[in-house]
């Protein structure tokens, strides 16, 4: 034990979230760690994690994301809207339905294209087998070797395919996949963010680590577990 290298925690590099209150509590997101994020549907998990990736790029880190819920173009638009900010977002209306939507201005889009180039990478979930755990892990490893990515996102655990034939196999598959992500984070000294939806909780207002759906190994293997909820005015 006495021969273990002495490391000053303050010297370890971390990627800040850009949320001062959160950064002051955890010191940022450190290499070789896995963070699990949970919360009710529509609570803002994907939005916040998209912002964390943008913040990482702003800190000269390269990032790689897997999204099992959004197509590539929808994921891109979501990230671009966040990165552009309100000054460079235009409100438009569909001439047939009247539905309003928001779009990044051409000026800002061109700037963001140049800013994100070779810094922000997205796994292609439309490719055959692109949502299997083997494909995700393989692409993540390639992103480290080829592009030097240091921050990763899996959004979300339920969208990955494990080849399970029953519930028991599915939960073991989830646990094994989380274990592979932990090993990947430690081996490559990167940080992995993982979105895991909570199980049904009969309207419970506050969610904790025990509310994460699937196997308990998901949170047991994580370095950080965060629960997001949308607060309403009382």
Annotate each predicted stretch with a short phrase.
Residues 67, 153-154, 195, 221:
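Generic enzyme active-site microenvironment
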Residues 69-73, 126-130, 158-160, 197-202, ...:
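Conserved nucleotide-binding/hydrolysis micro-motifs of P-loop NTPases
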Residues 24, 60-147:
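Cytosolic-facing regulatory segments adjacent to core modules
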Residues 1-88:
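The Walker A/P-loop phosphate-binding site
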Residues 25-28, 42, 78, 107, ...:
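Phosphate-binding/switch region of NTP-binding enzymes
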Residues 35-37, 64-66, 121-123, 193, ...:
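Hydrophobic/aromatic beta-strand patches that form the interior of the parallel beta-sheet core
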Residues 22, 154, 192:
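Catalytic phosphate/metal-binding cores of nucleic-acid and nucleotide-processing enzymes, i.e., regions
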Residues 121-187:
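Phosphate-binding/switch loop-helix module in NTP-utilizing enzymes
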């Amino acid at each position: 034990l006495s021969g273990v290298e002495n490391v000053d925690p303050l010297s370890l590099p971390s990627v800040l979230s850009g949320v001062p209150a959160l950064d002051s509590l955890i010191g940022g997101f450190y290499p070789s760690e896995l963070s699990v994020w949970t919360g009710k549907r529509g609570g803002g998990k994907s939005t916040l994690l998209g912002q964390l990736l943008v913040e990482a790029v702003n800190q000269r880190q390269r990032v790689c994301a897997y999204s099992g819920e959004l197509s590539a173009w929808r994921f891109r638009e979501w990230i671009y809207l966040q990165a552009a900010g309100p000054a460079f977002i235009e409100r438009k209306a569909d001439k047939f339905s009247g539905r309003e939507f928001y779009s990044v201005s051409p000026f800002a889009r061109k700037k963001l294209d140049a800013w994100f180039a070779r810094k922000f990478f997205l796994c292609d979930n439309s490719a055959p087998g692109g949502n299997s755990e083997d494909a995700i892990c393989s692409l993540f490893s390639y992103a480290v070797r080829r592009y030097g990515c240091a921050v990763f996102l899996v959004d979300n655990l339920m969208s990955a395919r494990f080849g399970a034939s029953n519930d028991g196999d599915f939960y073991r598959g989830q646990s094994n996949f989380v274990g592979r992500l932990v090993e990947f984070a430690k081996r490559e000294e990167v940080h992995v963010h993982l979105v895991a939806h909570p199980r049904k909780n009969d309207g419970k207002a506050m969610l904790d680590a025990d509310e994460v759906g699937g196997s308990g190994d998901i949170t047991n293997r994580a370095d950080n577990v965060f629960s997001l909820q949308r607060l309403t005015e009382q």
